Amino acid sequence: MDARIVNALIGSVYETIRDVLGIEPKTGKPSTVSHIEIPHSLVTVIGITGGIEGSLIYSFSSETALKVVSAMMGGMEYNQLDELALSAIGELGNMTAGKLAMKLEHLGKHVDITPPTVVSGRDLKIKSFGVILKLPISVFSEEDFDLHLSVKSGG
């Protein structure tokens, strides 16, 4: 995968989490993986079309999701994954994908993003094709977020 795209992804994730949650995230070492493993119970998927075809996939635990929602609501404690919480989780992914789209535009790759899809449950599996980049992220605790960028073409 083009290093400029990897750097755009890392920058987008870092800036979005910092600006939206008010927390300086630590990004782990990006790596190319053969398939997407979902160790957590909550997933946000956003499609990417245009100059790059693929998906941006966030995953984290329900506990981490509630911390994200609380931070997005200005620190107000939130303790249930209701429609409002799931909408906020989707919006975090949407903001990350939007920032990535702007950075890709500067690289000459015009992309559009789909609305986020949020899925929760156990033993989630996602099948994706193309090159898959995994980026572990530490926000509230060690590697509590996983991010995957799956690129079928254009990357």
UniProtKB/Swiss-Prot annotation:
EC number(s) recorded for this UniProt protein: 3.-.-.-
One example of a Gene Ontology biological process annotation: chemotaxis
Domain of life: Bacteria
Hydrolase keyword on record: yes
Any one Gene Ontology molecular-function term assigned to this protein's record: hydrolase activity
EC supergroup of this enzyme: hydrolase
SUPFAM superfamilies: CheC-like (SSF103039)
Keywords of this entry: Chemotaxis, Hydrolase
Pfam families: CheX (PF13690)
Subunit structure and binding partners: Homodimer.
Xref: PANTHER family: CHEY-P PHOSPHATASE CHEX
Similarity field: Belongs to the CheC family.
Known role: Involved in restoring normal CheY-P levels by dephosphorylating CheY-P. It has a greater activity than CheC.
Record-given protein name: CheY-P phosphatase CheX
